[in-house]
């Protein structure tokens, strides 16, 4: 059965004109034409409390309302097509004419019989320069001081007159001391350090001492409350956590990422596990695969590919790296025992197909790093800085006076010319740290002294070897056994590599034939 074609309904305005009188209009047509939809009601109720007049918010064209669009911060808009607005001045215009400051005299009408010569008259204009300014200076005398009382001493006896003149009092002087300090970021003032001898001030601290003695009567005042000593900024203590931390950033998330990354390498069903004992695996793993020259500027932190012909067999330096085609970059993980493990994933190229594809298994090479033993901490000392107690030495208070007689020379001693005291040995020998060695444990040096054959009287050659040597003369009449060298006889050489039954005669044993020349 064919489905009827849907016919489009007429517009809502035409339907409303025909069905309004009969009262058969659909509800949606009535709401749309009479503006009684939900959206229209929201706008009607909202406009009762909020006024948006002049903004042009409606479904009509965007004209900006009655006043047009007005940019923010400017005056009213200008409509296009209207008559321009005439701007009227705010001030009343003045007439152009002579000023009222200078009077203008009117001239009488000139008659034909009057003379054309105009007499000149001296006129004085207004003085525009300022006049004399009167200056009055008042001098106030300073306060007068009463004269100082001078005491006069008189004497009634007949002695000579002594006049005592008192010094004039010195007026007090005002002294102003200023200090300018510039901030230097590269210089740090040490506010706590031990001063050297003779210093009484250090950095920005000034110590003022008054008096060198004193006596305390009675006991010291006890502390009313318990006081606490605040440590200096140079003294601090490092608290060790319990238990001690194993990593600098103990975050569980980082550990999970490391375990997830290393989980695929430890799968024994898919990857072969090989523990490498050679320490070159950490720094130069390529030297374990093939013999090559080292490049110090190249760091083997990337994946390495080794090109090797499968037809030619090359023995690697390490048998564990046989037929290695690819060796990955290092990966670091943590073992269950807490050690750091360096891992590299390699691939072997054992079998090659006819198409040229090489097939091999995956190998996980790893090496566990050894433990770093922690040594006992060494107490370090600050260089140039000392915190805590400070010692100040005052020279005038703690002085030592030594009475020295200039006429006496303590270094000169009185010894007579023939005194036996000059032969005395005043040095004290101390053998507390000495050791007595008996026997020839020390290695002795052997020197060869050459002897020359001569018919003259005995003369000897002694080599100077920084020591004392005694040369004894020898009797030349005694016979000396001379061992002469053995005659030059050929040596019989036996070659064991010859498996034949015959012997091999050395060329030195063969008979030499002389060549006979034929004379022509």
From Swiss-Prot:
Cysteine pairs forming cystine bridges in this chain are 19-25
PTM details? Answer: Highly phosphorylated.
Question: Which ranges are annotated Polar residues under compositional bias?
Answer: 151-160
UniProt entry tagged with the keyword DNA-binding: yes
A molecular-function term among this protein's GO annotations = DNA binding
Q: Which InterPro entries match?
A: Late_L2
Q: Please provide an example of a Pfam family that matches this protein in its UniProt record.
A: Late_protein_L2
Q: Region annotation Disordered: residue ranges?
A: 139-176
**Cellular component annotations (GO), alphabetically ordered:** host cell; host cell endosome; host cell Golgi apparatus; host cell nucleus; viral capsid
Q: Where is this motif: Nuclear localization signal?
A: 1-10, 511-519
Q: Which biological processes are named by the entry's GO terms?
A: microtubule-dependent intracellular transport of viral material towards nucleus; symbiont entry into host cell; viral penetration into host nucleus
Keyword list, A-Z: Capsid protein, Cytoplasmic inwards viral transport, Disulfide bond, DNA-binding, Host endosome, Host Golgi apparatus, Host nucleus, Host-virus interaction, Late protein, Microtubular inwards viral transport, Phosphoprotein, Viral penetration into host nucleus, Virion, Virus entry into host cell
Where would you find this protein in the cell? Virion; Host nucleus; Host early endosome; Host Golgi apparatus
Per UniProt, subunit arrangement is: Interacts with major capsid protein L1. Interacts with E2; this interaction inhibits E2 transcriptional activity but not the DNA replication function E2. Interacts with host GADD45GIP1. Interacts with host HSPA8; this interaction is required for L2 nuclear translocation. Interacts with host importins KPNB2 and KPNB3. Forms a complex with importin alpha2-beta1 heterodimers via interaction with the importin alpha2 adapter. Interacts with host DYNLT1; this interaction is essential for virus intracellular transport during entry.
What does this protein's UniProt record list under function? Minor protein of the capsid that localizes along the inner surface of the virion, within the central cavities beneath the L1 pentamers. Plays a role in capsid stabilization through interaction with the major capsid protein L1. Once the virion enters the host cell, L2 escorts the genomic DNA into the nucleus by promoting escape from the endosomal compartments and traffic through the host Golgi network.
Q: Which family does it belong to?
A: Belongs to the papillomaviridae L2 protein family.
Name-wise, this protein is Minor capsid protein L2
Record organism: Human papillomavirus 21
């Amino acid at each position: 059965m064919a489905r009827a074609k849907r016919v489009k309904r007429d517009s809502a305005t035409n339907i409303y004109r025909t069905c309004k009188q009969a009262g058969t209009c659909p509800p949606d047509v009535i709401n749309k034409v009479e503006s009684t939809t939900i959206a229209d009601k929201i706008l009607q109720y909202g406009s009762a409390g909020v006024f948006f007049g002049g903004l042009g918010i409606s479904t009509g064209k965007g004209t900006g309302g009655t006043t047009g669009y007005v940019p923010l911060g400017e005056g009213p808009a200008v409509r296009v097509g209207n008559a321009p607005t005439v701007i009227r001045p705010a001030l009343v215009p003045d007439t152009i004419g002579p000023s009222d400051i200078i009077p203008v005299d009117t001239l009488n009408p000139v008659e034909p019989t009057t003379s054309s010569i105009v007499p000149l008259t001296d006129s004085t204009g207004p003085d525009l320069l300022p006049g004399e300014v009167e200056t009055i200076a008042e001098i106030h005398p300073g306060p007068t001081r009463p004269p100082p009382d001078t005491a006069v001493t008189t004497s009634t006896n007949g002695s000579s007159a002594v006049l005592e003149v008192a010094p004039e009092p010195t007026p007090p002087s005002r002294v102003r001391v200023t200090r300018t300090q510039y901030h230097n970021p590269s210089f740090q003032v040490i506010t706590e350090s031990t001063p050297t001898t003779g210093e009484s001030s250090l950095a920005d601290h000034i110590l003022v001492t008054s008096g060198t003695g004193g006596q305390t009567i009675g006991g010291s005042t006890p502390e009313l409350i318990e006081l606490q000593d605040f440590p200096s900024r140079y003294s601090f203590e490092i608290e060790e956590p319990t238990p001690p931390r194993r990593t600098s950033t103990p975050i569980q998330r980082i550990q999970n990422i490391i375990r997830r990354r290393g989980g695929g390498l430890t799968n024994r069903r898919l990857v072969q596990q090989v523990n490498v004992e050679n320490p070159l695996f950490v720094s130069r793993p390529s030297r374990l695969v093939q013999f090559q020259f080292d490049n110090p500027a190249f760091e083997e932190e990337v994946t390495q590919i080794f090109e090797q012909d499968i037809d030619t067999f090359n023995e690697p330096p390490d048998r564990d790296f046989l037929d290695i085609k690819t060796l990955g970059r290092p990966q670091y993980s943590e073992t269950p025992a807490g050690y750091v493990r360096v891992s590299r994933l390699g691939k072997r190229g054992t079998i090659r197909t006819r198409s040229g594809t090489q097939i091999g298994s995956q190998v996980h090479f790893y090496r566990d790093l050894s433990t770093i033993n922690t040594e006992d901490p060494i107490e370090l000392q600050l260089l140039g800085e000392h915190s805590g107690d400070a010692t100040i030495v005052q020279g005038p208070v703690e002085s030592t006076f030594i009475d020295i007689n200039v006429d006496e020379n303590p270094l000169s001693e009185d010894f007579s010319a023939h005194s036996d005291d000059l032969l005395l040995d005043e040095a004290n020998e101390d053998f507390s740290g000495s050791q007595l060695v008996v026997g020839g444990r020390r290695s002795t040096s052997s020197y060869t002294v050459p002897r020359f054959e001569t018919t003259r009287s005995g003369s000897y050659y002694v080599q100077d070897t920084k020591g004392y040597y005694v040369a004894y003369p020898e009797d030349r009449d005694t016979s000396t056994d001379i061992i002469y060298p053995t005659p030059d006889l050929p040596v019989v050489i036996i070659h064991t590599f010859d498996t034949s039954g015959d012997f091999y005669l050395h060329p030195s044993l063969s008979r030499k034939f002389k060549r006979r020349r034929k004379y022509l």
